[in-house]
Design a protein with these regions (language model features):
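N-terminal glycine-rich phosphate-binding loop for ADP-containing cofactors
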Residues: 2-581
Length: 581
């Protein structure tokens, strides 16, 4: 959320010139390898740590200068002056790239470009003053303040175990069992073995279990081809994964992670088989993304050791793990689980049990709002562009396809059955009708079968399914894109506030970090609760009421928000990010 304000925007171009690569380095934070930095002229020499002192001495003895290049009388700007006709061509392209990359949501990136453009046209002392002014402007911007608080201060706190119960000793997980060798189970096996933990990967037949291990082989072969690992490290990691059908091999496991299909009967069966083999104090974690943990724990002989461990796909890339506390989950089990998550170098958030927990529940509002807009007759392309313009990593309909429409429909139909079993009315909305049409009648499951809201040709780019305009008749009057952007952000923030009110969330850090890392909520907001604070609680509630009048009760602010508005409170009070003010 900040700019490199200690001279970075002025020294870098004077060392390496103004190129597209340098623009990416400064504006997007694109990392440079030492070799790349050397070739760009950003550093003098690359050496290993054992030879560091000798290299420094040699640099001095060989006539290394204390004078910076730009202070030399003979200095020439690398690649030619940036304000010549040739040099000026780069700025137009940079402005276009910035717009495409950020949709003007990030003040820091705009400030970097301005500091570069203005600073390289004057002597460096004046350039540094220009940079300092832009740095001050960015520091005072609420977007930067939100990002620093969420992505630096609060994320560091969570990574260091801020939510871990302190009264328990460190739990050293040395062996785990993974039940289910599908995509999730295979990914969990890889990140766990990478942390040096022995893995027993179980599936119903040996071939599937072997395929699960092969996933690690493919990832390691790719890393090997990119020189990110060695053959020795590859073999060491693979030696830690044992694919099998034999539950007896779970003996001695400190932790079990169940990653089978979202089916209560199958989960109950594998739970019983695993618990028959493991120690009384071992932790049993379920990777369910939607089924309530307390219900699954009823099939456990030790519900106090039962906990939800929700990974995100692909496991090896996604940095978040959502830990779900069941009604009977003990604090010791939470502490043990957090020690494991810390060991595999993921960021943990802790939530209480409910349908969809936190991340799946709120994530669904983003894609659901996209489908609702479609039902209103809003053009699909406008919906998709508005989603990306809010700062979301993917457009809503494309994201729904990627997650799988049939999976979302299964969750919806299961929820409907559960509502009916509890004697509650399940609302049949236009969204429900569209999903029923897409999955049950059209057989469009999303990217997985190459047809969803988009078509996925074997050779070529995906494109919106042309028949969508017939499925949902387009309205003649199309809304302003700013209205759509507002809906996408507000619906996520409102549902998050409901989670906080219902005690699903108990810490605002979990809410904000979980949203950004879990489903990619626009990082410039700092997360959904930071977004509410940035808008201002009174203004947020007033605007939400307007949206509710126009689009339905899903936008109606919950009692917590109304109470906070009456007292003019905020979620992040000064000096304390763990609870509402």
């Amino acid at each position: 959320g900040l700019i490199p304000g200690a001279g970075g925007t002025q020294r870098v171009p004077r060392l390496a010139g103004i190129t597209q690569e340098i623009m990416g380095f400064l504006m997007a934070g694109t990392p440079f390898t030492p070799k790349k930095a050397l070739s760009a002229g950003l550093i003098h020499e690359v050496t290993d740590k054992d030879n560091l002192i000798e290299a420094a001495k040699k640099y001095i003895l060989d006539g290394g200068k204390a004078v910076q290049p730009w202070d030399e009388k003979s200095y020439k700007f690398p690649g030619g002056l940036p304000y010549t006709p040739k040099g000026m061509m780069i700025w137009g392209a940079a402005s276009s790239s910035l717009r495409k990359m950020s949709y003007n949501n990030y003040p820091a990136q705009s400030a970097i470009l301005s500091a570069l453009y203005e600073g390289v046209q004057v002597p460096i002392d004046a350039g540094l003053r220009i940079e300092a002014r832009y740095f001050t402007k960015v520091v005072m911007d609420p977007v930067s303040q939100n990002m620093v608080r969420s992505l630096f201060v609060n994320m560091q706190a969570l990574n260091k175990g801020a939510r871990r119960p302190k009264e328990f000793d460190k739990y050293d997980v040395k062996k785990i069992g993974i039940l289910g060798a599908g995509l999730m189970g295979a990914g969990i096996a890889y990140v766990t073995a990478k942390a040096g933990i022995e893995v027993v990967l179980i599936d119903q037949d040996q071939e599937n279990a072997e395929k699960g291990k092969d996933y690690s082989v493919k990832l390691l072969d790719k890393a090997l081809s990119r020189k990110k690992t060695t053959e020795e490290k590859k073999e060491k990691l693979l030696s830690l994964i044992t694919p099998t059908t034999d539950y007896a091999l779970l003996k001695g496991a400190d932790l079990i992670v169940e990653a089978v299909f979202e089916n209560r009967e199958i989960k109950a069966e594998v739970t019983a088989k695993a618990e028959a083999q493991i120690a009384e104090n071992a932790v049993f974690g379920s990777n369910t993304s939607t089924l309530p943990i307390s219900g699954l724990a009823q099939n456990s002989s030790r519900p106090n050791n039962f906990i939800g461990i929700h990974y995100f796909s692909p496991v090896e890339k996604m940095p978040l793990v959502e830990i779900i506390m069941g009604e009977k989950t003990s604090q010791e089990t939470l502490a043990k689980t957090m020690d494991y998550v810390q060991k595999i170098k993921k960021t943990p958030i802790v939530v209480n049990d409910s349908r969809g927990f936190y991340t799946s529940r709120v994530f669904g509002t983003y894609t659901g709002e996209g489908v609702a807009m479609l039902a209103e007759g809003i053009k699909p392309a406008l919906i998709e562009n508005a989603g990306k313009m809010t700062g979301m990593p993917m457009a809503p309909l494309a994201l729904a396809d990627a997650v799988a429409l049939d999976l979302a429909w299964k969750v919806t139909t299961q929820t409907k059955k559960d509502f009916e079993a509890e004697g509650k009315d399940f609302p049949i909305t236009p969204m429900y009708s569209i999903m029923e049409e897409m999955v049950d009648k059209q057989g469009r499951f999303g990217k997985k079968n190459s047809k969803g809201f988009y078509e996925y040709p074997e050779n070529g780019k995906k494109y919106l399914w042309p028949e969508l305009s017939n499925l949902c008749k387009e309205s003649e009057d199309q809304p302003d894109v700013e209205e759509l952007k507002k809906r996408f952000l507000y619906i996520q923030a409102i549902e998050t506030a409901k989670c906080y009110e219902e005690n699903v969330l108990t810490d605002v850090r979990d809410a904000d970090i979980g949203a950004i890392l879990g489903w990619g909520m626009a990082p410039w907001t700092g997360g959904p609760l930071s977004f509410i604070d940035m808008v201002g609680i009174k203004d947020f509630v007033a605007e939400a009421d307007k949206l509710a009048q126009k689009y339905g009760e899903r936008f109606t602010p919950c009692k917590l928000l109304r109470d906070m508005a009456a007292k003019n409170e905020s979620f992040h009070k000064s000096g304390n990010s763990s609870q509402a003010a």
